């Protein structure tokens, strides 16, 4: 007989700084209510994201009924990557009136390549259009 498949008890989605997960909120309470060993997750996450320090890395944690877990790392949010590329701290308060920065189409394509696996697009050009739309809604102009 094949081994029994674990039954999923919950799915937790978090955005945590790479290599900086600790039991303090938001990580502790989110995992605690599902009965997951918080320190075990923090150590595993920090080890997995060590190379991406400085970025916010979203994570999807699958918690099973026997209180074990596994997690899938996603790519950093497009907005964070755009802010980094543009060299600004935050987007515009009124994006269609005040522009805060600008990025080149090459930078947008680079971000699209990074995000390609998480985006709902068939090729890099479509992914770049999605990223350009995000930039526009943040008050960042795309040149080229």
Swiss-Prot record:
Task: Spell out the InterPro entries in the cross-references.
Answer: Ribosomal_uL11, Ribosomal_uL11_bac-typ, Ribosomal_uL11_C, Ribosomal_uL11_C_sf, Ribosomal_uL11_CS, Ribosomal_uL11_N, Ribosomal_uL11_N_sf
The entry lists its GO molecular-function terms as: large ribosomal subunit rRNA binding; structural constituent of ribosome
Q: Which UniProt keywords apply?
A: Methylation, Ribonucleoprotein, Ribosomal protein, RNA-binding, rRNA-binding
CDD domains per UniProt: Ribosomal_L11
- Post-translational modifications: One or more lysine residues are methylated.
Q: Origin, by domain of life?
A: Bacteria
User: Which GO terms fall under biological process for this protein?
Assistant: translation
Q: Name one GO cellular component term.
A: cytosolic large ribosomal subunit
Ribosomal protein as UniProt keyword: yes
Under the heading Pfam families, the entry gives: Ribosomal_L11, Ribosomal_L11_N
Q: What does this protein do?
A: Forms part of the ribosomal stalk which helps the ribosome interact with GTP-bound translation factors.
Recorded family membership? Belongs to the universal ribosomal protein uL11 family.
The UniProt entry, under HAMAP family, shows:
Ribosomal_uL11
Question: Subunit structure, per the record?
Answer: Part of the ribosomal stalk of the 50S ribosomal subunit. Interacts with L10 and the large rRNA to form the base of the stalk. L10 forms an elongated spine to which L12 dimers bind in a sequential fashion forming a multimeric L10(L12)X complex.
Q: What's the protein here called? A: Large ribosomal subunit protein uL11
Q: Which organism is it from?
A: Rhodococcus erythropolis (strain PR4 / NBRC 100887)
């Amino acid at each position: 007989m094949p081994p029994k498949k674990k039954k999923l008890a919950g799915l937790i989605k978090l955005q945590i700084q790479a290599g900086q997960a600790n039991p303090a909120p938001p990580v502790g309470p989110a995992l605690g209510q599902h009965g997951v060993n918080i320190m075990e997750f923090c150590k595993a996450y920090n080890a997995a994201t060590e190379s991406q320090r400085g970025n916010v890395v979203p994570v999807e944690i699958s918690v099973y009924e026997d209180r074990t877990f596994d997690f899938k790392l996603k790519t950093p949010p497009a907005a964070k990557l755009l802010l980094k590329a543009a060299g600004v701290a935050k987007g515009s308060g009124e994006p269609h009136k005040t522009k805060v920065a600008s990025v080149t189409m090459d930078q947008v394509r680079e971000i699209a390549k990074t995000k390609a696996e998480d985006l709902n697009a068939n090729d890099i050009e479509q992914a770049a259009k999605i990223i350009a739309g995000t930039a526009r809604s943040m008050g960042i102009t795309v040149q080229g």
